[in-house]
């Protein structure tokens, strides 16, 4: 049986909301420096590969790598773009063979604990002048998530759902500034 607290990634279900998911990633890409000329790009938590493929189109001379923990997502990514190096692994212990010029992490790092250790480690994986581009959603703080938590805690399903709730380990923005400065 699968662990109910561990997210299961279904590429078909994930694709149903592709436009909504892509919006934040595209905004993040648009914030990358215009003069960025990376040789090594890593997309951490690449899922089905759309963002890594866009990064490869934007930087065709770069070696692009996509890292994800889901074999099903990586299978979909490989079908999308065989020229990208797709790697199954865990962001929490990931270390690149070569320093990265761009580490792109859209909606992936909020799943991981211990940002006090994770973020400095990601910065250490960058080449001099490299860019760490991160977007983490704050969905858990919205009203609809509060209603979902309330509903999950009541009714005949409450016992089956106990222990499943997970609050992302996000820090105060000022603390991220301190870690990255």
Task: Go through the PLM ranges and name each one.
Residues 4-21:
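Class I SAM-dependent methyltransferase Rossmann-like catalytic core
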Residues 20-39, 54:
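Conserved alpha-helix/loop element of class I SAM-dependent methyltransferases that forms part
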Residues 40, 130-131:
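Short glycine-centered segments of the SAM/dcSAM-binding site in methyltransferase folds
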Residues 40-94:
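Class I SAM-dependent methyltransferase SAM/SAH-binding core
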Residues 95-103:
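A short acidic, Gly/Pro-enriched loop at the edge of an enzyme's catalytic core
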Residues 102-115, 138:
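A short SAM/SAH-binding and catalytic strip from SAM-dependent methyltransferases
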Residues 112-113, 126-128:
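Helix-to-beta-strand junctions that scaffold the AdoMet/dcAdoMet cofactor pocket
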Residues 116, 131-181:
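Conserved catalytic/acceptor-binding region of the Class I
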């Amino acid at each position: 049986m699968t662990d109910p607290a561990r997210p299961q990634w279904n590429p078909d279900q994930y694709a149903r909301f592709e436009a909504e998911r892509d919006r934040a990633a595209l905004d993040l890409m648009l914030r990358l420096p215009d003069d960025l000329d990376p040789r090594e790009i890593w997309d951490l938590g690449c899922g089905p590969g759309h963002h890594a493929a866009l990064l490869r189109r934007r930087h065709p001379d770069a070696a692009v790598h996509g890292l994800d923990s889901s074999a099903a997502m990586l299978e979909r990514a490989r079908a999308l773009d065989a020229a990208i190096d797709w790697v199954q692994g865990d962001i929490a212990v990931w270390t690149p063979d070569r320093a990265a010029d761009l580490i792109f992490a859209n909606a992936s790092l909020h799943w991981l604990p211990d940002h006090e250790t994770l973020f400095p480690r990601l910065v250490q994986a960058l080449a001099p002048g490299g860019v760490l581009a991160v977007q983490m959603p704050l969905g858990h703080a919205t009203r609809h998530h509060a209603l979902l938590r309330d509903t999950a805690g009541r009714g005949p399903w409450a016992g089956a759902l106990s222990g499943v709730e997970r609050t992302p380990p996000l820090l105060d923005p000022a603390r991220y500034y301190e870690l990255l400065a």
